[in-house]
Amino acid sequence: MDMRAPAQIFGFLLLLFQGTRCDIQMTQSPSSLSASLGERVSLTCRASQDIGSSLNWLQQEPDGTIKRLIYATSSLDSGVPKRFSGSRSGSDYSLTISSLESEDFVDYYCLQYASSPWTFGGGTKLEIKR
């Protein structure tokens, strides 16, 4: 019996299944935003696949320090001011800051942890309007 055919089929199936693996893409918008002190702003991440409530919002300081603000879509981390809130509408996840303060003008990222590998949005740079 010729064993080359089963080996070729196995190889083809292996390539096929590797090719169908698709990491979850997180599309974050806007990439940058200019706003004024006291203004209300919202940032959005859209998930390419269902991630349920498995979404964090992170804040990155200029020195690289990362702080989690929101976990499980809408739960506020301990010590995070109540002006931050998270919500979901379908595959769109939002971070809202109700009244901007000077320390809020940094970078923000969403992170999905529903499926490995965990994936980040591209980030939003929040700048003060001059």
UniProtKB/Swiss-Prot annotation:
Which keywords accompany this UniProt record? Adaptive immunity, Bence-Jones protein, Disulfide bond, Immunity, Immunoglobulin, Signal
- Region (Complementarity-determining-2): which ranges? 72-78
Signal sequence span is 1-22
Q: Where is this region: Framework-3?
A: 79-110
Pfam families in the record, alphabetically?
V-set
Note down the stretches annotated as region Framework-2.
57-71
The yes or no answer to whether the keyword NADP is present is no
Set out the biological process GO terms recorded for this chain's protein.
Answer: adaptive immune response
One Gene Ontology cellular component term attached to this UniProt record is: immunoglobulin complex
| Positions of region (Complementarity-determining-3) | 111-119
The domain of life for this entry's organism is Eukaryota
- Give the start-end ranges of region Complementarity-determining-1: 46-56
Query: Per the record, which residues fall in region Framework-4?
Result: 120-129
Q: Please list the disulfide bridges.
A: 45-110
Region annotation (Framework-1) ranges:
23-45
- Fill in the misc note: This precursor was synthesized in a cell-free system directed by mRNA isolated from myeloma polysomes. This is a Bence-Jones protein.
Name listed for the protein in its UniProt record? Immunoglobulin kappa chain variable 9-120
Q: Which organism is it from?
A: Mus musculus
Gene name linked to the record: Igkv9-120
